[in-house]
UniProtKB/Swiss-Prot annotation:
Its EC number is 4.2.1.20. This is Tryptophan synthase alpha chain. The gene is trpA. It catalyses: (1S,2R)-1-C-(indol-3-yl)glycerol 3-phosphate + L-serine = D-glyceraldehyde 3-phosphate + L-tryptophan + H2O. The active site is at E34 (proton acceptor), D45 (proton acceptor). The lineage of its organism: Bacteria, Thermotogati, Thermotogota, Thermotogae, Thermotogales. It holds the Pfam family Trp_syntA. The alpha subunit is responsible for the aldol cleavage of indoleglycerol phosphate to indole and glyceraldehyde 3-phosphate. It comes from Thermotoga maritima (strain ATCC 43589 / DSM 3109 / JCM 10099 / NBRC 100826 / MSB8). Coiled coil: none annotated. GO terms for cellular component: cytosol. One of its GO terms (biological process) is L-tryptophan biosynthetic process. NCBIfam families: trpA. GO terms for molecular function: tryptophan synthase activity.
Length: 239
């Protein structure tokens, strides 16, 4: 099995359910989980994930509360924090304190959707930041990736916001990017079926699935969500 990263929005429908999901996913042997930090203006996300952000914010979920929850669990997969830039740089106790806490928790990297690759070097964040590549990313920008320290590269397989798609465009471009970079390449944005996962695995190192899992969380009673999410991940993995 190649790589598989699940996106789980923290605090949707509440942090206790998030904790149960993270523990339940541990049995599946996946590569990692992106923990989504809620934000009031999630410009890169589609309506399904935007709803999760708004519910979590109404629940009073903050990065600090997310870190407290993460400190209570132990998992075998890699953890990543996906957050817009504002909550990171405006962490109440200071950005350095946040980065120190992330390091203690073993979080492998930050995923910051509103931080373009060319701007990463201008932001004073001493932590591995996952770079984004899109179908319209220029070759000279792609080549910059080889000079950054990151756990993987996040390929956005569709223009615009996140959400489920029926097709897998840009396969040729994904292959070209894979040839140019040294880091593992994970493809996300729009993957919701095992057939799509298999197609990505043929040309990249792994997939990232978000909206398809958040939709499961949205459509099921709270006490059934962890089990239903695990079932969906198993389906995506072809288990």
């Amino acid at each position: 099995m190649k790589g598989f990263i699940a996106y789980i929005p923290a605090g949707f429908p509440d942090l206790e359910t998030t904790r149960k999901i993270l523990i339940a996913l541990n049995e599946l042997g996946i590569t990692g989980v992106e923990i989504g930090v809620p934000f009031s203006d999630p410009v890169a996300d589609g309506p399904v994930i935007q709803l999760a952000h708004s519910v979590a914010l109404r629940n009073g979920v903050t990065i600090k509360k997310i870190l407290e929850m993460l400190s209570e669990i132990s998992v075998d997969y890699d953890l990543y924090l996906m957050s817009y830039l504002n909550p990171i740089v405006n962490y109440p106790e200071g950005k350095e304190k946040l980065l120190d806490e992330l390091k203690k928790l073993g979080v492998k990297g930050l995923i910051i959707p509103d931080l373009p690759l060319r701007e990463v070097k201008n932001v004073d964040i001493a932590y591995p930041i996952v770079p984004f590549v899109a179908p319209n990313t220029k070759d000279e920008e792609i080549d910059l990736i080889n000079s950054v320290q990151a756990p993987f590269v996040y390929y956005i397989s569709r223009y615009g916001v996140t959400g489920e798609r029926e097709d897998l465009p840009f396969a040729d471009h994904i292959k070209r990017v894979k040839e140019r970079i040294k880091l593992p390449l994970f493809v996300g944005f729009g993957i919701s079926r095992h057939e799509q996962v298999k197609k990505v695995w043929e040309i990249a190192d792994g997939v990232i699935v978000g909206s398809a899992l958040v939709r499961i969380m949205e459509e099921n009673p709270k006490d059934e969500i962890p089990r239903k999410v695990v079932e969906k991940v198993k389906e995506l993995l072809g288990k």
